[in-house]
């Protein structure tokens, strides 16, 4: 192990030497650039663009382009990038992550690679964690890029499609990660090329890359439509759950006590009914066996009600706003996430718990993970002060290396060892005493909490102590920038949940660094408990001691903290017993304790990484399917020529499936079976007089296929004659294909989503859930393709086309499924199908009619009934 560590350190040193040499080369252009007039410096942009057009690469232009941007920043912003910032900029251009300490000027560092890559004209996306930072950075840095002759756009959720398209067409576009992902999904739901907003994905530079590519990666981006409402069942399950006896997650000391109706696994935060709880459920719902197959839906509602009431904590996992809406709280930033909802009915269960209106469940129409979205960029890089702890994840998932960049000035912050107390009460008493002591000296103090609840508790105690202070949490995030701006002033006391002000500088006020005692110089950061991620702790610490300023950090912990309860509190308690440390005010400083806590954090980080990896593994299964469907959709939308050859392939395969299906159900030499086939053809693709029994009788299977195909071609030609204008024919073809593809694709991914939630149970049967999911999804995909081709054939053949009437296809509304959209002036004949009898067809076999659906979901419904 020491050899591996030594090797990594040596690699970092080699990389830094190389970056140092390259940065010196950029600096060698400084005099030349300084002597240029403003007009001459601005003229460098078109000159560099021309050199790219003539075949020079971006790497060839790096030194000169960086020097141009550096000099322009000095003139426009009054800021001149340091040597270490140039090094960071080179790492970003190379598609990697420079780890730069908080306060080292990451925003300015990004200007150089953004300028260089924007010269290609292919677009650069600068990605931030929220819309406030996107707007701020675009306003501040946009001035520099505009001065240099580049166009800058801002992409926000509130923008119209026209405004979004304009923003994406700029050389540089500022946006949030979620908005980029949703725009990609929406672009693949439109029905006209002119409605698309994004260009091909080229280069993304992600600010706070660990927050976006790691923390947010557990939450897939989903566009959904409404499913049927089940409000009454949520309320009923909630009523039952409130009758149960047991412990809440926030006060649980053990997983289960004798007589409890449910038990909680503290490590995985899962919950299940005990035997006593199951008995109560069966009596409450008046059923014999809760886990009978017929009660599967009920157990789903009960499980969600259990999680909502005993695992999901008010003001920690979510809050209820003044509009009686349940808002999720981001566990890493402390901000609320409007528009985001827990999936699979959990959000509705929380709404029932809080007695607020229950919103309808949703049906997935399009989805993608953050990981798979960003992996589509040709080049991806990002900036953060805390990425080294997630180095393996960046390398394995994104193929990105982390390069630590030295600070411009040495760090002067004093980082004290953790202080551990036996109880929460003793810990908070010590925190308040420390705040009083530092406040009396005029030192600005930033208190970091993990939950809104804790921030309000400390605020209450500070009010009692008559110490003026500000609270920054999910409930007042709109004042975030203003609160953080004043947090460095003399005597300021600020409480922040999960450092919600990340990305906003805390500038020290006059007199703050002049105290005679180093302990009271600069900003004091007080952590009230360790977060489950070491990065979040490091981000909190990093608010102090920026750019070589003095500062101090101190974490206060207790054995009753959530992290300690979940991991390792028994060992720590045993250690305290051995050391004979007892009493409410007992406190311990020990390297062993700190190491124990760090190993607990590593375990949580490992669990979280596994969780993100699993999300990615499931999404990887449908990634290829999504890319194929979206690529084919694009071809249809962008088609300028008649799509008859494509349609003929669909007709041919549909006919083959129908004939082969009937042959499997019973020999087509039998006249009764031929009649069944004829009835199917009349129902799905040919009129009554289009083909007759006598024409099919006595033919071989292949001869039947050829005859039917000839008849279908003739029927298609007569349909197209009603649309004499080639442009109208193309629009009709496009409308039919897109309607069918969108309907079937949304059904497919919703089915995959439901299967993913159930496939995990197969692990109990010693089956690998991922492998099972891959195999099932592949079968479902092939069935979907068959269903698409069948439905397109049916619509093209049976649609009643009104001659000389314009056809217009509209994009599907995001709140509904594509199947609910109407295609103007295209209607399907309502032919009543006669019941067809199929012998020897299994329930789960494909229906012989060729629809691509399982027999039990198609003609088998009547047969099985």
Curated annotation (Swiss-Prot):
- Record has Lyase as a keyword: no
One GO MF term on file is: ATP binding
Which cellular components does GO assign to this protein?
cell envelope Sec protein transport complex; cytosol; plasma membrane
Class of this enzyme: translocase
Chief site of localization: membrane
Query: Subunit composition?
Result: Monomer and homodimer. Part of the essential Sec protein translocation apparatus which comprises SecA, SecYEG and auxiliary proteins SecDF. Other proteins may also be involved.
Q: Which PANTHER family match?
A: CHLOROPLAST PROTEIN-TRANSPORTING ATPASE, SECA INNER MEMBRANE COMPONENT OF SEC PROTEIN SECRETION SYSTEM
What is its biological role?
Part of the Sec protein translocase complex. Interacts with the SecYEG preprotein conducting channel. Has a central role in coupling the hydrolysis of ATP to the transfer of proteins into and across the cell membrane, serving as an ATP-driven molecular motor driving the stepwise translocation of polypeptide chains across the membrane.
HAMAP family per UniProt: SecA (MF_01382)
Tell me what this protein is called.
Answer: Protein translocase subunit SecA
Origin species:
Lactococcus lactis subsp. lactis (strain IL1403)
